[in-house]
Amino acid sequence: MCSSDLLMETLNVSSLWGLPVVFVCENNGFSEFTPAAEVTAGRIADRARAFSVPAVEVDGNDVTEVWRAAGEAIARARDGGGPSFIEARTYRIQGHFEAESFVLGNGRYRDNEEIEAWRQQDPIALFRDRLVSSGTAGAVDLDRIEAGVLDRVADAAAYAEAGQPADPELAETLMFAPEPAGSRQQESEA
């Protein structure tokens, strides 16, 4: 999507109007099954710069680097400095969609060694290691936090699975705002 006309229009308007928007491009190196370099000319962050939107490129697998860039962009937006663009370079470990192997068969577009090399750069594991090695947090404390999160996720999944299916008759009830009183009457009189 970082090459789409919609993004270009949005960057233009946000810059023109000085909107407090923070754009984050998760550049995973692919456009579906094609390496991004084969379908995208130039640097993605330069697209934002072309519209005078401050842009930074960060290692999307470095939690601290992303946090700092986001903090600066958020501060700029809150201070009335207009939009910012963050390109977080990372890698897509999972496929583009669940049925990818069925659709592609053996026609894989990346090899297992490449995927495994990037798996070793998991941002959560790297940040955890940094927290423990710096003494900022203990492994036991982080294990307890992770266990608590996993429990909450399991509880939420169990709650959802135990719930009743939605009533199909209600499917469209919250899609539109209520019509103002008398609006249909005004249309018929026109």
What annotation goes with each model-predicted range?
Residues 155-190:
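C-terminal intrinsically disordered, low-complexity extensions immediately downstream
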Residues 4-155, 159-162:
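Glycine-rich ThDP/TPP pyrophosphate-binding loop and its adjacent helix/strand module
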